[in-house]
Amino acid sequence: MQGSVTEFLKPRLVDIEQINTTHAKVTLEPLERGFGHTLGNALRRILLSSMPGCAVTEVEIEGVLHEYSTKEGVQEDILEILLNLKGLAVRVAEGKDEVFITLNKSGSGPVVAGDITHDGDVEIANPEHVICHLTDDNAEIAMRIKVERGRGYVPASARIHTEEDERPIGRLLVDATYSPVDKIAYAVEAARVEQRTDLDKLVIDMETNGTLEPEEAIRRAATILAEQLDAFVDLRDVRVPEEKEEKPEFDPILLRPVDDLELTVRSANCLKAEAIHYIGDLVQRTEVELLKTPNLGKKSLTEIKDVLASRGLSLGMRLENWPPASIAED
C-alpha cells in the first residue's frame, strides 16, 4: 500500500444490494478505524431527520367537521383515516412547494391511494396503500388533500399556532412526515487492504417510501453533511457584516411642499412670493427675515411658528447641504 502514513484512506462504493425497489444495502470501504461509526451515525441521523420530501399536511372530508367523528358508510373513524393518509408516499415535481389532490369514491370496498385524482406534477408511489373501507354500495367519500414540501417531521400541533385564525371549520391538520426514509440502520464490519486488517467497512441498510431511491438518498445525505462541514474547513470569521440602514440626509418632512402645512391663503401666498416652496426652505428663515416679506404680518408669523412647532420644527434652523439634489434638479 503506497502513500504517506499520515494520509487517510479514501473509501469507495463497493456494492449496492438492491433487495427491492424501496430497500437496499449500500457498502463502503475501506475506512480508517473508527470512521465507520463516525460517518455511519452522522449519515443515519441526517437520513432520519433532515431529508426533504413531500407529505400530506391538511385534508377536508365532505361532511366531516372535526377529527373526533365518524362518517356514515365508512368503516374507519376520522382519526384512523388521517393516520392512513400520513402513509401516502407522494412525489411532487420540482419547483412546486404545495399541491392539492382529490379523492372521490363510492361503493363497497377499499379506498386506496390509486383512487386519488391528481395532475402530471404529482406521483403516488404506493397506489395500493389503503386509506379506508366503504361498507355498503351506497357509501361514498370525498376529500381534498393538501400536499406540501418540507423536511423532517412536523406535528400538526406545531402548525396550529402558525395557521390563520380564520382556518375554515372542517380543514383537518395532519402530522407531516416529510422524510422519504422509513428505516435506516448501519453496521461496521472488519475490512482489509493488503497487510492492514484494522480497517472498517460501513454497511448501510435502508428502506424508503418509494419516492426516492436508497442510493440517491445516501448521496443527498452526504451532500448535506459536506455542506455543513464546509464551515470547519476555513475557520476564519465569515460572518456577513450587518448592513447599516442608511439614514436619509434630511428629515422627510423637510422635503414636503409648504402647501402641506395648510396655512391660510394669505400666509401661503406670501411664502410663494419669496420662493419658499419646501418646508426645508421655510425653517431656515428667521422671524426677522419673514417679517420683511411684503404683506406678511405678526399674525401670519405666529401662525407659521405654531404650525411648525406642532411638527417639531422651528424657524432659524440650519440645514447643511440644502437643498438636496432631488429638489435642486426640480
UniProtKB/Swiss-Prot annotation:
* EC number of the protein: 2.7.7.6
Catalytic activity of the protein: RNA(n) + a ribonucleoside 5'-triphosphate = RNA(n+1) + diphosphate
Q: Where is this region: Alpha N-terminal domain (alpha-NTD)?
A: 1-236
An example Gene Ontology molecular-function term = DNA binding
A biological process (GO) of this protein is: DNA-templated transcription
**Under the cellular component aspect of Gene Ontology, which terms does the record hold?**
cytoplasm; DNA-directed RNA polymerase complex
Q: Does the keyword Transcription apply?
A: yes
Give the range the annotation lists for the signal sequence.
Answer: none
Q: Where is this region: Alpha C-terminal domain (alpha-CTD)?
A: 250-330
Q: Does the keyword Nucleotidyltransferase apply?
A: yes
Q: Which InterPro entries match?
A: DNA-dir_RNA_pol_insert, DNA-dir_RNA_pol_RpoA/D/Rpb3, DNA-dir_RpoA, RBP11-like, RNAP_asu_C, RNApol_insert_sf
Name a Pfam family for this protein: RNA_pol_L
Main enzyme class: transferase
Which controlled-vocabulary keywords does the entry list? DNA-directed RNA polymerase, Nucleotidyltransferase, Transcription, Transferase
Its domain comment says:
The N-terminal domain is essential for RNAP assembly and basal transcription, whereas the C-terminal domain is involved in interaction with transcriptional regulators and with upstream promoter elements.
Q: What does this protein do?
A: DNA-dependent RNA polymerase catalyzes the transcription of DNA into RNA using the four ribonucleoside triphosphates as substrates.
NCBIfam families tied to this protein: PRK05182.1-2 (NF003513), PRK05182.2-5 (NF003519), rpoA (TIGR02027)
This protein's assembly is summarised as: Homodimer. The RNAP catalytic core consists of 2 alpha, 1 beta, 1 beta' and 1 omega subunit. When a sigma factor is associated with the core the holoenzyme is formed, which can initiate transcription.
- Family as reported in the entry's similarity comment: Belongs to the RNA polymerase alpha chain family.
Which named protein is this? DNA-directed RNA polymerase subunit alpha
Protein's organism:
Vibrio atlanticus (strain LGP32)
